[in-house]
Amino acid sequence: MDLRLRRGTDRDAIAVSALYLRARKAAKATIPMTVHPDDEVRRWIAERIVPHTELWVAEDDGGALVGLLVLDEDWLEQLYVEPTLTGRGIGSELVGLAKRARPKGLRLWTFESNLGAQRFYERHGFRPTERTAGDNEEGAPDILYVWDAS
C-alpha cells in the first residue's frame, strides 16, 4: 500500500474523529474506554486538536484516511491506525515522521495495559522512564516513554 502523509486540516476533522473512535473501540481490551461521549470527542478533535496541534494524517492510494498522528511541542499525543490495517507499517511511517519533525526528542504516555503499544514504541527506540498509578482522567496506570536521537 502506498501511503501519503500530509498535514491534517479542518476538512479532516470528521474522518480523524471517526478513525480515533474506531481505533479506541477496537483496542478496548488493552486500553480503557474514553470517559467522554463520542460527540464530545468529535468536538475536542475539531476545536482543540485540529487548530491547536500539529495533526498529520496518512492516506492510502484511494485517499482514505488510514492513520493519524498528533504532535504538541515534544509530545507525541496521539497515534492511531485503522484497526483493520495494523501491522502494515502505517504506524511506523507515522513514528518516523514524528522523529523527523522532532529530531531533539519525543515523549508520550501509553497505558500500562497496552502491551502492544509498549512493544511498538520500544522497537522504535523509545524507552520507559516513569510509571504512574493512574493519575489520568481514565484512572488507569500508564507509562511515560521517551525517545532521543542520541
What name fits each language-model region?
Residues 17-46:
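Conserved GNAT-fold acetyl-CoA-binding loop/helix
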Residues 57, 63-80:
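Conserved beta-strand in the GNAT
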Residues 85, 89-97:
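Conserved acetyl-CoA pyrophosphate-binding loop and the N-cap/start of the following alpha-helix
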Residues 107-110, 127-144:
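Conserved catalytic-core motifs of GNAT/GCN5-like acyltransferases
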Residues 46-57, 75:
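A short helix-loop-beta-strand connector motif used in the catalytic cores of GNAT acetyltransferases and
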Residues 4-18:
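A short beta-loop-alpha structural element at the N-terminal edge
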